[in-house]
Amino acid sequence: MIIITIRITVMRMDWKTYVTHGNRCFHNKHWVDAERHYGLALHAVEKEEPVIHQNGDILFAWLACHHNLATLFQSQSKHSEARFYLDTPLEILEKTLGNTPPDDPFFISLLRAYQTGLNALCLFEKAMNSTVASTATSQTQENVK
């Protein structure tokens, strides 16, 4: 009897590759694939524990993964899911900022990440408010007819 062993090597992509694939899927409106790739990117980045290891580049990659998922869900009008991916990093960053002394060199990276997150949330809220306003205007115009 002959036994043949087949060795399969599974190539794990890094978070940058997942984001690149996610972006490609997003631009082609392949929402399910984009969500999967962005989710895998987020999972890969979270393994690096950006807040614990105080790595600014990984911290911003982590934040970008959340924002990509938020943008993906917002483009599909899944606003509560989008909001989740905007709120979650802000909550973690806020807690971490509260536990980090201002003279810690990583404090500035945390603060910048928090500001970036707040800006994204403000843009989301502005878009939601303009959507609500335009919907209300359309309904009012329909009622007037």
Identify what each model region corresponds to.
Residues 112-145:
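Terminal, low-structured helical/coil segments at or just beyond the last alpha-helical repeat
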Residues 18, 59-62, 66, 111-114, ...:
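TPR repeat positional signature
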Residues 35, 39-50, 88-98:
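Amphipathic alpha-helical segments of tetratricopeptide repeats
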Residues 18-19, 26:
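Alpha-helical tetratricopeptide repeat
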